[in-house]
């Protein structure tokens, strides 16, 4: 537990909140070269879900749903959890390592069995890191462990007609609308501040390509041929 109250924590800027809840974390898988990016995932042994959209007073309902899965699982509350705004993390060990391709359809199917509408839309990322649990000094901390057989990866994937068909994957309701709003808020390049904005207001893409084509060719030539180029 930390020294600030939940009310104080919620009043902090996001940067400070992130600093306080960063008590280390885990992925539950392996990466080539220890590079935590989707392209480097070698396998995942844990399915992990952030349930950030649980209705007030429904913590026990979620715990019952997880218990009803009948497989090994752990549930703990995340930093902002409260009885009026529950936030829980669900961890489910697999009976075999999931490949990078298998992970997302498997974790989405698991989410649908619990209630995918409660999930953070970004929680299905194969390279996502989860923080170890922490809480404020007056927070309600939830931690439940269900000591049962590991979840069958093939059992989850077998619930699909074809698990490689992304059209069949369960989705968080409204996730597409959220993404569209996020993209709509992206800053217009010509309205950016500083040198980037000034450059974009001066040159269109085609104008920039024409203006700097000779320089681009020189740079490519210098990178492809390992010799010293004398600048005149």
Label every model-predicted segment.
Residues 119-180:
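Basic/polar, cationic surfaces and motifs that engage anionic cell-wall
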Residues 1-46, 56-60:
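DNA replication initiation on ssDNA origins
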Residues 22-27, 31, 37, 153-159, ...:
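Intrinsically disordered, low-complexity segments enriched in small/polar residues
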Residues 28-32, 78-80, 125-129:
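Short, glycine/charge-rich beta-strand/loop segments that flank catalytic centers
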Residues 38-68, 79-116, 131, 136-138, ...:
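Modules that initiate DNA replication and primer synthesis
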Residues 71-77:
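A short linear hydrophobic-aromatic micro-motif
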Residues 20-23, 27, 73, 117, ...:
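Short secondary-structure junctions and interdomain/linker hinges
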Residues 4, 15, 54-57, 98, ...:
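Short coil/turn linker and secondary-structure boundary residues
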């Amino acid at each position: 537990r930390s020294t600030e109250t939940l009310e104080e924590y919620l009043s902090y800027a996001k940067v400070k909140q992130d600093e306080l809840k960063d008590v280390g974390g885990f992925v539950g898988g392996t990466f080539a070269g220890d590079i935590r990016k989707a392209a480097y995932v070698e396998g995942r042994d844990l399915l992990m879900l952030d349930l950030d959209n649980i209705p007030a007073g429904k913590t026990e309902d979620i715990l019952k749903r997880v218990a009803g899965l009948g497989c090994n699982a752990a549930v703990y509350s995340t930093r902002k959890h409260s009885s009026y705004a529950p936030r829980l993390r669900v961890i489910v060990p697999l009976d075999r390592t999931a490949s990078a391709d298998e992970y997302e359809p498997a974790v989405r199917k698991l989410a649908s069995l619990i209630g995918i509408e409660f999930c953070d839309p970004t929680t299905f990322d194969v390279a996502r890191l989860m923080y170890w649990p922490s809480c404020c000094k007056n927070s309600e901390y939830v931690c439940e462990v269900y000591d049962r057989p590991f979840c069958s990866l093939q059992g989850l994937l077998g619930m699909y007609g074809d698990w490689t068909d992304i059209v069949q994957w369960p989705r968080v309701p409204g996730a597409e609308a959220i993404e569209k709003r996020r993209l709509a808020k992206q800053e217009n390049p010509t309205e950016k501040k500083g040198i980037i904005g000034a450059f974009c207001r001066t040159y269109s893409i085609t104008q920039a390509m024409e203006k700097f084509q000779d320089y681009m060719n020189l740079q490519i030539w210098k990178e492809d041929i390992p010799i010293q180029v004398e600048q005149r």
